[in-house]
Amino acid sequence: LKDFDNVESTNIDFKEFLEKDRPKSWLKTVSAFANTKGGTILYGVRDEDREPVGLDNIAEVSSKVSKLINCKISPVPRYELNPFEDNGKDFLAVNVGDGPETPYYYSSDGRKTAYIRSGDQSLEAPDHILKALILKGQNKTYDGIATEYKLEDVSFTLLDATLKKEAGLIVNKDR
């Protein structure tokens, strides 16, 4: 446990136990880590005071985590389950890598939601970030998106003239 900072951050999240009945509570963090810069969910540490309480039945917890990530996150991100013991207590570190196939969605009840990590929170990705994640997953940038305009139909001179005309900076002599 001494390898982990004692505070939640952009790349670490503490969970006292696996919430089997509320998997969204931690699966959104898996999505957020995969869509951002990766991170670790550490099971067996109480969130409020960072007290190491350990886990009961580490094998069952590991199996359930793996099953739910594989079923509920799409595409499945790179992740590792690292069970370990400290002071006679069992813990599970779930290391989630950031991935190239963004966005990584959490799926539930027919709805897909992409999350990002912001500070110590996992938040639903706003539209502009979701669009950037989609482009990243396609290995594209905004500059690389095809346009409907032909190169000969656009120029900085034409843009400048149109802007001045629309802004009323050019007086039309015919009026």
Model-flagged regions — what are they?
Residues 1-175:
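Conserved N-terminal catalytic/coupling substructures associated with nucleotide/phosphate chemistry
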